[in-house]
Every structure is written in structure tokens, then in C-alpha cells.
Amino acid sequence: MILKFCGIKTKVEALSIRPLNINMVGFIHYPKSKRHLDIEQINKLSRLLPDEIDRVVVLVNPTLQLIKKIINATNINAIQLHGDETIDFIKQLRLNFKNIKIIKALPATQNIINDINQFKEHIDLFIIDTPSEQYGGTGQSFDWTLLKGLDQSIPFLIAGGIDVDKIKQIETLKLNHLGYDISSSIETDGMKDKNKMLTVIQQVKGEL
């Protein structure tokens, strides 16, 4: 399964993650987030990670100009859109940045299947998260049974306060998810905790 650890903020965190058996690391570029990093910070931290780990920048309603600036100035290879981006915008993104993976976060609502169908031709991976009036993660869970209608043709990760106990619950539902996007539950006092990360990896992948 795919594991994405999101909200990396420091060199210490990046170095602790570098040897771990995970697939994606998220850097947040959104000033309203407590995990916000500027472009130079993202550049430095993204270059500490091996090529086998996707380096994802998380953005909210960005411009194409901002995305181009980040791509040119950092070592990221994936964009995660966490706002109200339109299909036309994503088409432009795909046209301009052919080698960049595009990830779209969507809220888990009764309309989730329709929402995914609108975007799926242009998106490499979806992240299904808890609905919120604010942009970004909430650390709260949602009704995972909403995802039972998503078949294997839809590549998606589950987010929203995911921890080891919730992973165990989700696995009993036999969903078609590819993995998990995790942030707050692998932190202690606001910093990524290596022991908590290893516990999640052991649960999801069965090996460290």
C-alpha cells in the first residue's frame, strides 16, 4: 500500500523520514497552515529525500505562475491541489507540466463519486479527506463507507485523522483504496515522531 506522510517542516524530520519505507512526502505551501513552508525551505528539504520517494507540494488555489516557480526552484515531482481548482485549471496544469504528478484532494461527501468522475481523466491520484469549512486537513475522520462505491479504476488515498487503530478499522471494510495520507497522528508535540511513523509503516506495509 501507498503511504504518504504530510506536513514535513524541518531538516530533522526530513532526515528521519529519508530511510523509511514510505512512498510520498508532503510539503505544505499555504500561509494559513501551521505547517506552511516557503519555497526555499521546500527546496532544501525536498533535496534531502531520495528519488524513490515522491516529493509533493500541497497548494490551495494556486496560480500556474506559482506552480511554475515552485517546480523550477525545488526538487518536487508532484502537485497536490487542496482547494477549489477547476477542471480547466487542471487541464492547463497537465498541459504545461507533463512530467509532474497531479494529486487532487476532495471532501468525502455524498457527491464524492460524481466529484471524482469530473476530474479522473486528468488526475494521477485522489486524496479523500474529511469535509471542512477551511482548506487543508482537519485531523478528523469521516464515514469511510462513503468510499464503497469507488472501484479499482479510481486511484485514491484515505486521509482524515488516520492512525493505526483507524487503519485496522478501514481494512475490515474491503475498500479499493491504494493507501493512506497521514500527518497529525505521527506527531508528538507538533513534530514528526519516528517511533509513531515506524508503527504505521509496520501496520500498513508489514515491514520497515
Swiss-Prot record:
Disulfide bonds: none annotated. Keywords: Amino-acid biosynthesis, Aromatic amino acid biosynthesis, Isomerase, Tryptophan biosynthesis. Its EC number is 5.3.1.24. One of its GO terms (biological process) is L-tryptophan biosynthetic process. Coiled coil: none annotated. Pfam families: PRAI (PF00697). Pathway: Amino-acid biosynthesis; L-tryptophan biosynthesis; L-tryptophan from chorismate: step 3/5. It is an enzyme of class 5 (isomerase). It catalyses: N-(5-phospho-beta-D-ribosyl)anthranilate = 1-(2-carboxyphenylamino)-1-deoxy-D-ribulose 5-phosphate. This is N-(5'-phosphoribosyl)anthranilate isomerase. It comes from Staphylococcus haemolyticus (strain JCSC1435).
